[in-house]
Regions:
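The N-cap/first-turn positions of alpha helices
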Residues: 12-15, 39, 71, 78, ...
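Short alpha-helical "packing" element that flanks the helix-turn-helix/winged-helix DNA-binding module
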Residues: 15-22, 74
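Alpha-helical linker/hinge and terminal dimerization helices associated
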Residues: 52-53, 74-94
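Short helix-boundary/capping micro-motifs
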Residues: 20-36
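Short, Lys/Arg-enriched N-terminal segment that forms or immediately precedes the first helix
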Residues: 1-7
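Helix-turn-helix DNA-binding elements, focusing on the entry/boundary residues of the two helices
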Residues: 27-28, 46, 60
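A short LG(V/I)-centered, amphipathic sequence patch enriched
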Residues: 50-67
Length: 94
């Protein structure tokens, strides 16, 4: 069983949301537009993701950023969880 007090569970949901959108958009500027934040905010998020997961996350390839295999796999796993969290926060409370 997972230790719920583990420091590895200290996740920033916004950071995970940035990861998902970065993998989808493959562009810092389009990610910033979609999330209604500045490009420096997205760049700072990339830096935090790289440090947190010890992975380049995105690698420049011409005009776009290509996700690493780890970033792609993480985004694919995280996206449905983020959707569910959003749905839970939108449900009426009774």
């Amino acid at each position: 069983m997972t230790n719920l007090n583990s420091s590895s569970l200290s996740l920033d949901l916004n950071l995970l949301r940035y990861l998902v959108v970065l993998v989808q958009e493959k562009s810092v500027s389009r990610t910033a537009e979609r999330l209604h934040v500045t490009q420096p905010a997205v760049s700072a998020a990339i830096k935090r993701l790289r440090l947190t997961y010890n992975d380049p996350i995105l690698v420049r390839s011409g005009q776009t950023m290509q996700p690493t295999p780890r970033a792609f796999d993480m985004a694919r796993a995280i996206e449905p969880m983020l959707k569910r969290v959003y749905e839970m926060t939108q449900e009426q409370q009774f």
